[in-house]
């Protein structure tokens, strides 16, 4: 998922949406499922696919996603994301309000996620992994998707289509990856080889631009959010299906899945333990503090021992003020009068609600499109 924090990462949306003419008769260069596109949306999606497919890296990601059965469509305009890969729906969605130039890298990024999900379907989900394994996996997935996106955009630039790379370089989400990528490419005399792709991957973890902020934002999503959900579940008296955080994923196994390409693994010659370095595995002080509180609460409620993988993870200073209350277990409401008191909703909670509503609206939109097409086939 790209640009999930609309307020923090809004620079990706600054470019005005172009209004080009799309060929209604054009067919996609890669045979993909466009069943969740309306007749009006289809020409634009075909144009985006065909533009990305002119790059070797872009075409590869599209072919893998298509082979895995992913559909391609546009998100509801209320979505806060530039693009999203819905593993559960087997769908890649793009935000229609974002410019075509920016959507090229987004399409590559989300298609790469589709391939990752397909290759890693036998690996435990992030919510089941211990904290250290979850951090490695989530960050590596984003770093790999961004690395592929910048390579695809560079390949297009080499053919004269410069706008996608410019849009990528100017987006806050792309700054770290792009800076390291261009430096490595120059050192390799302009040859786009595995070393450049690996360096672009590592660039996602750099301290360029807002990358340190991005890391902590993701920690709130893939570490703290499921923990908060579990605490809420405990407070409701339910301990069934609690997040266990006990499955392990080694750096070696992760790299074997993440670094795959049609020509081999671009990380094959790299010691996988680099993912355990402080820059790669470190988490914010607040993340560790809240996680420790969660494990204490969980032990009290369920008897499950703490996930000790978090103890060895180094920490860095928080990059922005606290947006959530401190992790805590709240006692059940004592009486009806207290129940009647309206809860104060934080700005972050309001933003999360908007994003959730946008995703629900997207699912409703796609279901409506599929239903209408089904009825049309039936002649109704």
Language-model segment annotations:
Residues 44-47, 56, 102, 106, ...:
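Extracytoplasmic/secreted proteins, especially bacterial periplasmic and envelope-associated proteins
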Residues 92-107:
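Short pre-active-site segment immediately N-terminal to the catalytic Zn-binding motif
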Residues 1-7, 11, 145, 327-380:
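Non-Sec secretion/translocation targeting segments of pathogen effectors
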Residues 116-134, 138, 380:
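Extended, hydrophobic alpha-helical membrane-active domains that insert into or remodel lipid bilayers
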Residues 104-118:
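Active-site recognition of the HExxH zinc-binding catalytic motif
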Residues 130-168, 172-173:
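Post-HExxH zinc-binding segment in Zn-dependent metallohydrolases
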Residues 182-338, 345, 372-380:
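Pan-zinc metallopeptidase signature
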Residues 21-88, 100, 311-328:
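Auxiliary, metal-adjacent structural segments of Zn-dependent hydrolase domains
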